[in-house]
From Swiss-Prot:
One of its GO terms (molecular function) is electron transfer activity. Disulfide bonds join 36-39, 101-128. The lineage of its organism: Bacteria, Pseudomonadati, Pseudomonadota, Gammaproteobacteria, Pseudomonadales. It is a multi-pass membrane protein. One of its GO terms (biological process) is protein folding. The chain crosses the membrane at residues 10-26, 45-61, 68-85, 143-161. Residues 1-9, 62-67, 162-163 are cytoplasmic. It comes from the Bacteria. Its main location: membrane. It is found in: Cell inner membrane. HAMAP family: DsbB. This is Disulfide bond formation protein B 1. Pfam families: DsbB (PF02600).
Length: 163
């Protein structure tokens, strides 16, 4: 007999996303850390994963629906993981080899075409390479990458599960 139903697991995954976003907002508004553009993209991926898991928890789909939700979570976690991995890589590059800092995301959205904003944000800057906070010697993007890997594992388990 399984320990938890797929519906309960989707709810648990949603609550984990809520906790992750709560932690991100705490670090931004209480601790005072400014989110770089890659951090904002990772937050968007966490929100989309959370909404997908919430939909799966509310609907309580059958096998086919659960697999569809699992594939969506997998793809979103893959995108978020790639973004987090890019930021982790940027943190290893010497500062003199990084591109200059970008203007705020709000300004870029108003002044530049959308495709250019996406290209600049995903390219990363010196802002994204700065390690301003760690927990157990892991930076925020490293924790984010671990969370995305956990969501990849979750989606695979949900996809392969029969009951």
């Amino acid at each position: 007999m399984p320990l938890a139903s797929p519906r309960q697991l989707f709810l648990l995954a949603f609550l984990a996303c809520v906790a992750i976003m709560g932690g991100a907002l705490y670090l931004e508004h209480v601790v005072g850390l400014e989110a770089c553009p890659l951090c904002v993209v990772q937050r968007i991926f966490f929100i989309l994963i959370g909404l997908t898991c919430l939909a799966g928890a509310i609907q309580g789909p059958g096998l086919r629906g659960r697999r569809i939700y699992s594939v969506l979570v997998f793809l979103l976690a893959l995108g978020g993981g790639a973004t987090a991995a890019r930021q982790v890589w940027l943190q290893t590059v010497p500062l003199d080899q990084l591109p200059a800092c970008l203007p705020s995301l709000d300004y870029m959205m108003q002044a530049l075409p959308f495709q250019e904003v996406i290209r600049l944000v995903l390219h990363g800057t010196a802002d994204c390479a700065q390690v301003s906070w760690t927990l157990f010697t892991l930076s925020i993007p490293e924790w984010s990458l671990l969370a995305f890997v956990a969501y990849l594992g979750f989606s695979i388990v949900q996809f392969l599960r029969r009951a």
